[in-house]
Structures are given as structure tokens and as C-alpha cells.
Amino acid sequence: MCQATNGPSRVVTKKHRKFFERHLQLLPSSHQGHDVNRMAIIFYSISGLSIFDVNVSAKYGDHLGWMRKHYIKTVLDDTENTVISGFVGSLVMNIPHATTINLPNTLFALLSMIMLRDYEYFETILDKRSLARFVSKCQRPDRGSFVSCLDYKTNCGSSVDSDDLRFCYIAVAILYICGCRSKEDFDEYIDTEKLLGYIMSQQCYNGAFGAHNEPHSGYTSCALSTLALLSSLEKLSDKFKEDTITWLLHRQVSSHGCMKFESELNASYDQSDDGGFQGRENKFADTCYAFWCLNSLHLLTKDWKMLCQTELVTNYLLDRTQKTLTGGFSKNDEEDADLYHSCLGSAALALIEGKFNGELCIPQEIFNDFSKRCCF
């Protein structure tokens, strides 16, 4: 892993490994509310350990049988007895006569099994067609966007769930893992043109993507990653790409140059944020947005490292939000480490080193191996 060039900071690799390992062991009762999010906890932990060069397939491969139990096949009560499948976040959510699988837990589980190198599962066990049919049913026919789950009574896309760029990314990533590569592959299961139309409708006037014409770093990364998986980045105009790059570069907070004069004028300016990235304009820096912004820049231009100050963001992560006592990364320098920010902080550092695939959010070496071994 990378090391800050200025100052004594370095990555406390052993403590980060222990931090992620703790989340795969017995968690305290305060985490009971997250029981339905077990697949997310496993993904963030396995991803973090993989970034820090832990052989997770050797260390946790014995638990693949337990992981596989979360894969549920359901026969819908329709005229065609349609079979769909996906993952539940926890076995307590495997409720008879109710469709409780959802897109996020399905993607978290699939990515975790890729990192655990359970290639036998993808090649011989996973019913990719029924899984793709579930993704298809989550698409809103009127907008082209996706919801995360089905109505447990009607088995149509949930009418109360939100639909946004996050779920569009998750849906396309699942189909990509299932073997979809060309537009024709995706068209077999979803209305790709309508999806592309929805993504384009989320473009903001000053660059980037977001709802209600307010650009957001996380949504921008989701939109660009979705377009990349669909091989459709060329649909963006050169002007929009340039505007988006400019907007993303302006999200890197600096205590140098003109920005230092904001200290008394901007309530959202904090000098200690120097080098970090904010998710929106007039917000404080946040560890996770370092990844979302850097991944977006990486997808837009091969010169991204020359445009942004990677040394400063590295120093920000290592000096400000890395927890040298407990391991992990926090949202900012005032809070404790949490699993989400620890994973994305580690991913940002790995992305700078060229060791992380931002499109699927897994280490590059694992992505390469999966692509080679599982050619559907």
C-alpha cells in the first residue's frame, strides 16, 4: 500500500487487517440492527482484507457453504410460474411465501464470492438466468431506472422503494457478473435504451450526475461505472465530460491558494480537510468521497492522476481519517472508524496505486482472475 510522502504517516496494515477481521467474527449486541445487512458487512470486510493482501479464499473458504445458503430461488405466482433468484441479507429474511431477495444484498454476495474465488459456484451452481430475470423485474418500465426489491404481494417492482442511480449501477453490475457484455446481452433482460435515457436525464447543468440538477459525487461514480459496464461512456459529450472533470477536481478541498480565504466566509470549510474530497459543493470532506471522486476521474480520463493532487488526498486519508490505534478509517477526523469508510478509504488508496477496479469495486488482480476464469 502507498505511503504519504510528507510526514511520518504510513498505512498501519496489520491494524487494518485486524479491524476488518473483527467484523467477520462475533459482533456486539449494538450491531443487531444490522443483521439484515450481513452481506454488506461481509463484502466490506472481505474487500478490505483483499486490498491489504490477505488471502481471503484460504482464510474464509470454509464458510462458502454458509454464504450459498443465502441464495434463494422463488417461483412467482403468475401465469408462467416465473423462476427468479437472488440473495437475502440474512437467513432471518428467508420468509416463506414472500419475495425478500433484493439487489444490494445480491451484488454484495456475488462480489464477496468472487473475492473468495468460488468459481465453481459461478460456473455450475448459480442460475444466472433466473437471477437476471429478478433484475429485469426490478426495472421501472416507465422510467428505465431500478428499484431494489419487489413488492412481496404482487412481485412487481416495489412502488414504495426509491429508484436512483445507485440501483441502476447495482442492477447492471449483477448482469455483468452473470455474463452480459454486449448491448445485445443486456437487452435480453432489461430495456437498455430506457436505462441509458434515465442516466442521461440525471446529468447536471454544470457537470456530474445527481437528482434535481444537484451533482453528487457518489451518484456520479455510480452513473459512470454503469456506463462503463455498458460500454457506453462514449454517449457522453466531450463538453459534459470536461465539465464533470472540472466539477470533480473542484471537490478536492485545499488549504492552499484562494481556498484558504474561505475560512471565515464558508461555514463548511475546515482547514484540516486539506486534500480530502467533498461529496457536494459547500460540504466538509469525507473519506468515502475520496473514492467516489477518484473513481469517476479514473473512468473519464487516463490523465486523472496528473489533474488531481493524489499526494494530498493520500496524506489526508493517512493523517486525518486513518485510525492508527484501532485500525480502519473514519468519515472524518472527529469520528470513530466504521466499516463502510474503512473499505472505501482503503479502496481509494489502492485505486491511486492502480490496484483496484472501481467499476466492480474489487481489487484489480481479483477482477482479472475472475474475468479469465469465468468466461460465460
From Swiss-Prot:
Highest taxon above the source species: Eukaryota
Record carries keyword Zinc: yes
Impact upon substituting residue 85 to F: In cdc43-2; severely impairs the geranylgeranyl transferase activity
GO cellular component terms given for this protein: CAAX-protein geranylgeranyltransferase complex; cytoplasm
GO molecular function: CAAX-protein geranylgeranyltransferase activity; zinc ion binding
PFTB repeats: 128-179, 192-231, 259-301, 310-353
Cofactor note: Binds 1 zinc ion per subunit.
Binding site for Zn(2+): 286, 288, 341
Family matches, as CDD domains: GGTase-I (cd02895)
InterPro entries listed in its UniProt record: GGTase_I_beta, PGGT1B-like, Prenyltrans, Terpenoid_cyclase/PrenylTrfase
Location within or outside the cell: Cytoplasm
Reactions the enzyme catalyzes: geranylgeranyl diphosphate + L-cysteinyl-[protein] = S-geranylgeranyl-L-cysteinyl-[protein] + diphosphate
Enzyme class: transferase
Note from the entry: Present with 3940 molecules/cell in log phase SD medium.
Function: Catalyzes the transfer of a geranyl-geranyl moiety from geranyl-geranyl diphosphate to proteins having the C-terminal sequence Cys-Ile-Ile-Leu or Cys-Val-Leu-Leu. Acts, among other substrates, on Rho1 and Rho2 and CDC42 proteins. Participates in a RAS-like C-terminal modification of proteins involved in nuclear division and bud growth. It is involved in bud positioning and cell polarity. The beta subunit is responsible for isoprenoid and peptide-binding.
Protein name (database record): Geranylgeranyl transferase type-1 subunit beta
High-level lineage: Eukaryota, Fungi, Dikarya, Ascomycota, Saccharomycotina
Gene encoding the protein: CDC43
